[in-house]
């Protein structure tokens, strides 16, 4: 595969575009655009039918989408900073068995969207400052059999939105200072939340369904007012995070 390493790109329509290129490495590049309107701007790192690509330690600002994966199975994004892009910091579709780890996605127009994929692992990322009615720290749509662990969601209008997502392991994440920390659509199911921290959010959990189809156990809630008489580390009274106003 190819190697694109340590370059500087300024005001390119598409800075790095890989099409049907297998096993490439895109590392340590500095990509910046002036932030033109979305329809006149392309993506920073764009993968199309490029399996096994590694996107590592790049900085991307002001593009349409910072990083775009489509039909690129088995690829990895690690240690990138994608911020201030017009649409998504990461836009990811139809790419099974991928990992993205230790990336920072900050102040992107619509946040991050991961869609229509299986076996995706999201570990140790920061989803920060996605603000607006259509902005999400992370949108997971039609994602199955994946993991969302050790991530930070902070300062977003909505931290995490799950729509049509199932069989996800959602564990040890921090949700702080979001409008809605987690929004679960009725189509999201069988995705247990364990060991997560919910602090200083306007609303911790909301849903458009009468029942939650995913379990919450062993999480920390700043709004919990119960007690732990047996001192086993878990509250003796269940916490119910969904409030009426979270549904409005």
Which sequence ranges carry the predicted segments?
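Short, conserved, surface-exposed binding loops centered on an aromatic residue
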Residues: 113, 150-151
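Extracellular beta-strand/beta-solenoid scaffold signature
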Residues: 1, 10-18, 38-48, 62-68, ...
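Generic detector of contiguous secondary-structure segments
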Residues: 3-26, 100-117, 178, 182-188, ...
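Parallel beta-helix/beta-solenoid
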Residues: 4, 16, 20-21, 26, ...
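Short, flexible active-site-adjacent loop segments at beta-strand->alpha-helix junctions, enriched
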Residues: 8, 22, 30, 51, ...
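Functionally critical loop-and-helix segments that line ligand-binding/catalytic clefts
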Residues: 3, 127, 131-137, 154-155, ...
